[in-house]
Every structure is written in structure tokens, then in C-alpha cells.
């Protein structure tokens, strides 16, 4: 059976082309002894296999065989593409691989049915384009194994929302350029959360900018609250 999943602790999680940017960064945090909730990745190759075995890939290729149309037409194509992904059956071996990884995660957590978040983790092949996490709809929350295959397909389908298509079109989008994995990670209730990123400083180097909020970072991602902001030399 093909390997459809990679745990964040496994060496394969170093490969952005397999696990996507977000999962790769989580693996690096683990390597540096930073505490990260347990999880695994449904690999980018799994999406390729799903599209091929379900017939969805041929339907999507037909939809995107011409240049993307104007706004109204784009909305129609987007809806058809999303429906194609969500309406296609996942093969038994792919579903079994994903459920098997979830059950292994449950044993790690000593929990019968761990609550997990299921965002998409994208890499552009072969590193031609920047990565913008906020472009994609994300983070379904699953409470047991029965909804997991649906959540994974929803993550894949987020590649074909109008927002995603506009972004891809703006950077010279091609179907073959996009490789998307799905991160399945134990969902915890944080006391505080946030994001950290680098920004140029006045001397030509980089400082670290940290934006933090109480509770979940979802409020920060959606712009609902004003974060505490710190700049570190």
C-alpha cells in the first residue's frame, strides 16, 4: 500500500514538496524542542492519487483547459470545481491510510477520538511562487474518524475557491504547479496564541514581529481582535 500519510515527527516531514510549508515548519519546531501538538500530514501525492483514481482530475482539467473567465464565470467554474472534489469518492486504500493514521494519533493521545483541526498545507512546485496561507479556506474541526474523509476533501476543495483561483491567476497559475497536503493536528484550547514572522530592519537585516491574542489564533486570522504586537531585534 502506498504511504498516504506522514507524521510530523518523521524525517519525510522535512520535504516541503511532500508535506507543504506549514507542516514542514511544524517539523522544524519539533526538531528544536518546541512543543507542538501531535499530528500527521495527508501528503501532496495523496491528492494526486485521489484526483487520478476518482476521475476528478480529468474533470478539473477540462474545467481549467481555457483561461480563467471574468468574475461571474470564475464563480461558476469555482463552484463546479469544488463540487467535483467534494462529490468524488476517495478510494478505499486512501481512506484506510488516513483513518489508520488518525487511530494511531488517538493511541498517542490515549484518547478514543481526539479532536483535530484539518487545514490545507500548500507548497508550490518547484518553489516558483510565494506561500500565502491566508489565501485558502481552512481549519475544519473534526471530533471523530467518521467525518475525517469529508474534512480532508474540504481542505483539497479550498484550492478551487474564487479567492484561491484569483491568487493562482495573479501569479501565472497552472494546475501542475500546485501541490497541496492536508495537516491533521490535535486541536487544543490555548491560553494564548499568535503568529511570528520576520520584517526588514533599518540596517538591512531582519527583526522578528510577534502578534499575539488570548485564546485561539482564529480571531487573529479573521481580524476580529487587535493583537498585542512585539518587535524583537
Residue positions per predicted region:
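N-terminal beta-alpha lobe that positions the nucleotide/phosphoryl donor
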Residues: 1-183, 190-192
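Short beta-strand elements
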Residues: 120-124, 137, 186, 195-216
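Conserved catalytic alpha/beta cores of large enzymes that bind or transform nucleotide phosphates
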Residues: 211-233
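Short conserved micro-motifs at the rims of enzyme active sites and ligand-binding pockets
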Residues: 129-130, 195, 219-224
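Low-complexity, compositionally biased segments
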Residues: 107, 204, 229-231
